[in-house]
Amino acid sequence: MTEYILLLVGTVLVNNFVLVKFLGLCPFMGVSKKLETAIGMGLATTFVLTLASVCAYLVESYVLRPLGIEYLRTMSFILVIAVVVQFTEMVVHKTSPTLYRLLGIFLPLITTNCAVLGVALLNINENHNFIESIIYGFGAAVGFSLVLILFASMRERIAAADVPVPFRGASIAMITAGLMSLAFMGFTGLVK
């Protein structure tokens, strides 16, 4: 049980996929201008990342390895992620049309979010079992959502602040992301 908690804390805080592994930077910068959009994207990505990790583990364990076709891993994982994202898009469209409109193009772009494919591939490379795959995918998703929501709330506050002209826009966003990354580095010694 302790190793599961350490895996969860490690993926959320210590080895955050956005701030440490630099995966998922496109939605991190693109969807983080408004807090409500960031929350919606975080929830959708949490669902997709967790489900894609589970599906990728199952495809790897019960299709690719038994047939000896591990070289098709990346292509099969992209197909799995595309199916999971389409399912998520249908669910969001039915349950929350407002959120569906707010997320716009970013919802189908979860398919090309490198964090989703990265988590699936790292899951397999680290030889996680089924439970660890679920925890790893969920922890990565919670870490992504946490960083996205924190960054969106900071960007909203910065938008209301008097920022010097040369630092407005992407410049101050990159500086803020760098400072967030430094703050998350404080968790480095928490989990080995």
From Swiss-Prot:
Instruction: State the EC number(s).
Output: 7.-.-.-
**Any one biological process term the GO annotation gives:** electron transport chain
Any stretches that span the bilayer, and where are they?
5-25, 39-59, 67-87, 102-122, 134-154, 171-191
Lineage: superkingdom: Bacteria
**Matches recorded under InterPro entries:** Ion_transpt_RnfA/RsxA, NqrDE/RnfAE, NqrDE/RnfAE_oxidrdctase
Membrane topology is:
Multi-pass membrane protein
Where it sits in the cell: the answer is: Cell inner membrane
What are the protein's UniProt keywords?
Answer: Cell inner membrane, Cell membrane, Electron transport, Membrane, Translocase, Transmembrane, Transmembrane helix, Transport
Q: Per the record, what is one GO cellular component? A: plasma membrane
HAMAP family recorded: RsxA_RnfA (MF_00459)
What's this protein's family per the entry?
Belongs to the NqrDE/RnfAE family.
Q: Say what the protein does.
A: Part of a membrane-bound complex that couples electron transfer with translocation of ions across the membrane.
Q: How does it assemble?
A: The complex is composed of six subunits: RnfA, RnfB, RnfC, RnfD, RnfE and RnfG.
The entry's protein name is Ion-translocating oxidoreductase complex subunit A
